[in-house]
Curated annotation (Swiss-Prot):
The keyword DNA damage does not apply. Its EC number is 2.1.2.10. The lineage of its organism: Bacteria, Pseudomonadati, Pseudomonadota, Betaproteobacteria, Burkholderiales. This is Aminomethyltransferase. The gene is gcvT. It catalyses: N(6)-[(R)-S(8)-aminomethyldihydrolipoyl]-L-lysyl-[protein] + (6S)-5,6,7,8-tetrahydrofolate = N(6)-[(R)-dihydrolipoyl]-L-lysyl-[protein] + (6R)-5,10-methylene-5,6,7,8-tetrahydrofolate + NH4(+). NCBIfam families: gcvT, PRK00389.1. It comes from Bordetella avium (strain 197N).
Amino acid sequence: MSASLKHTPLAETHLAAGARMVDFGGWEMPLAYGSQLEEHHAVRQDAGMFDVSHMLNADITGPDATAFLRYLVANDVARLNTPGKALYSCMLNPQGGVIDDLIIYYFAPDSWRVVVNAGTAEKDMAWMARVAAAGNFDVVITPRRDLAMIAVQGPNARAKVWAARPAWQPASEGLGPFTAAILPEDTLVARTGYTGEDGFEIVLPASAAVALWQDLVAQGVRPCGLGARDTLRLEAGMNLYGQDMDELVQPNQAGLSWTVSLKDAERRFIGRDALEQFATPCAFLGLKLSERGVMRAHMAVRTPQGMGLTTSGTMSPTLGVSIAFARLPLDVQPGSAVEVDIRGKWVPALVCKLPFVRNGKAVEHS
């Protein structure tokens, strides 16, 4: 293992399984254990799992916890009032740019959990601390590096989790999307994910991670690496922070307007003024390449309405063609024919709505 990189509680387990390890946001993480293609298909057709312990869980507690979060993020946590209920939101800077995207869980009015990206965790914690201090919010922000997180995804994922941990089934069987069961011993079983498939993201003590991983392997859940995670999230139309949006990109430039709540006019969250006064929306849509080739990030897109740019791209294992996300002129419509600059050649592509894949099946685009 690399001494200069951070490691999750499952690092030695990955190495023992023959994983190819890479640097991801300062963490040594598995890229793949064998065939990335087979790992991708396992999630679409059966069940696969990912070590996502590099992401940071942080608890936000105190009398002002709810007010603090209503100011900190663009979505409105006030609509969460059932323990375990969650929402997805962006945390914005005063210019409306995205500092990070995160999931927020409600435990009680004075107790919340946020899950932030690995590469932005230190920046996020520093930003939250500054916001809390500047606003005199009575909150305590506690990073929980004592916890691990495993995402089990696929049509058979939940059944295999219950086979490995039968005691979790009664509390988690009836969960709807974006809802978690809060279990004893610092365990959270959430019906969330980053693949477009059903499944759970499980937060548990770091000391319990290896045993759960091994028990899931025994149930036939396939370990998957970051390579498959990226192709799965692209097919599912899910953004990657640092690639599809960053601090210079507003939510309405990344297909994330739905994560911004403007209903309460008195809730002046950070970045709201910029969104209301200086919004520069654009179309954020999918592209499917019409010929051979592979789209990647930062490729020019030529449309009748003007130029655009890809933000993420890959070869889709499910569709068998290259797919991409692109920021395009606002009046470009799904179904439009465009061209993508691939190594100096303009290759035709079709504009389509996201996602490309839903519940393991290709979404039909006219």
